[in-house]
A protein has these predicted regions:
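Conserved mixed alpha/beta catalytic, RNA-binding, or beta-rich assembly cores of soluble enzyme
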Residues: 155-159, 166
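Terminal, membrane-proximal amphipathic helices
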Residues: 1-136, 165-284
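Transmembrane alpha-helix interface/packing and boundary motifs in multi-pass membrane proteins
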Residues: 136-149
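A general alpha-helical scaffold signature found inside nucleotide-binding enzyme cores
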Residues: 158-161, 258
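Active-site metal-coordination segments of metallo-dependent hydrolases
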Residues: 152-156, 173-174
Length: 284
C-alpha cells in the first residue's frame, strides 16, 4: 500500500507530522476495499473448516484436556494481558532508529509519526512473528498429533503478541482493556466465517468515535473459548495434515506462517484505519 506524507519540523515539539487530507482519504478507501474483500466467500474457506470434526475424534482425551488447560491460561489476556503483553519499549526504539533527529520516548510520540514509518515497523513485527510461528509449526510437526496439542495454543500466543506489536506501532496501548478487546476482535475477524466477518466489521466501524461501540464489542465476547475454537477451526486441512509425523513439519510451518500473515494483515488494516480516522478528524 503506497503511503503519502510530508514532514514539518517544529522546534521543541514532537508534533512535526502532517498528512494531506486527500492522501489520507485515498488510503482509507484502500482499507475499505480490503474490508469488502474479507466479506467474500472463498471455496477454500468452506472446505478448510471440515477436518476438525475428524480431528476431534482422532485426538486422545488427554490431549483434549491439555489444550483446554492451555486455553484457560490464554483466557486471562482479555482481563489483564497476562504473560502475553508485548514490549512497548523495544518498539519505541525502532521508531527512534527510523527517526534519529526526533525524540521518540513514548506512545504519545509514536502517535505523531508518519504513517509510512508506522506501516514499515508494523510489517516488520508481523514478518518476524510469522517466521517464529513457522519454526514452531515445523518443530511440532515432527511428532504428529502428540505435539500438535501444544502448537495451536503456542501460535495463539504469538498471534496475541503480533497484534499487540501492531497496536503499539500505530500508537495504541495494549495495556488498556479497550485495546485488548479490539485485539480479540482482530483475532476473531481473521478466523471468522463470512457472517462473522460482516458482523465484526460493522461492530468496529465507530470504535473510537462512539463509546457504546467498545462496550458492545466487549459484551459480545461471550467466552474466550468460543474465540479460540473458531481460531482453531480456521486452520482446517493444513493442521489436519500436520498430524502425520515428520511430514507434518512442512504442513505445520506453512499453516502457521499463513495464519500469522493473515492476522498481521488484519491488525495492520484495522489499526491503520483507526489512526487515519483520528488524523482526518484532526484536520476538520
Amino acid at each position: 500500500m503506497k503511503v503519502y506524507y510530508i514532514v514539518e519540523k517544529k522546534k521543541g515539539s514532537a508534533g512535526w507530522v502532517t498528512e494531506h487530507q486527500e492522501d489520507l482519504q485515498k488510503q482509507l478507501k484502500e482499507i475499505e476495499k480490503w474490508e469488502k474483500e474479507q466479506q467474500k466467500v472463498w471455496f477454500w474457506d468452506k472446505l478448510s473448516r471440515l477436518p476438525f470434526q475428524l480431528l476431534d475424534k482422532l485426538t486422545p482425551d488427554f490431549i483434549h484436556k491439555k489444550i483446554g488447560t492451555l486455553l484457560d491460561e490464554v483466557g486471562s489476556f482479555i482481563q489483564t494481558g497476562g504473560q502475553y503483553l508485548t514490549s512497548e519499549k523495544q518498539i519505541i526504539k525502532h521508531f527512534q532508529k527510523k527517526l534519529p533527529d526526533e525524540a521518540i520516548d513514548s506512545l504519545q510520540d509514536v502517535q505523531k509519526a508518519p504513517l509510512a514509518i508506522m506501516d514499515d515497523i508494523a510489517e516488520s513485527m508481523g514478518r518476524n512473528r510469522a517466521n517464529a510461528a513457522a519454526v514452531q509449526g515445523a518443530t511440532t510437526g515432527v511428532g504428529g498429533v502428540f505435539t500438535l496439542a501444544a502448537d495451536i495454543p503456542a501460535v495463539l500466543g504469538l498471534s496475541l503478541k503480533t497484534l499487540q506489536d501492531i497496536a503499539v506501532a500505530y500508537g495504541y496501548d495494549p495495556k488498556e482493556k479497550k485495546e485488548r478487546v479490539f485485539i480479540v476482535k482482530c483475532l476473531q475477524l481473521s478466523s471468522a466465517d463470512i457472517v462473522g466477518k460482516k458482523s465484526i466489521l460493522k461492530e468496529l466501524k465507530d470504535y473510537d468515535q462512539d463509546s457504546r461501540t467498545y462496550k458492545s464489542a466487549a459484551s459480545q465476547i461471550q467466552g474466550w473459548r468460543e474465540v479460540v475454537y473458531s481460531y482453531r477451526d480456521s486452520f482446517g486441512w493444513k493442521k489436519f495434515f500436520q498430524m502425520v509425523p515428520v511430514a507434518g513439519m512442512v504442513f505445520g510451518a506453512s499453516a502457521n506462517r499463513s495464519a500469522l500473515h493473515s492476522i498481521a494483515e488484519t491488525g495492520m488494516m484495522l489499526y491503520k484505519k483507526r489512526r487515519i480516522l483520528e488524523r482526518l478528524k484532526e484536520t476538520e
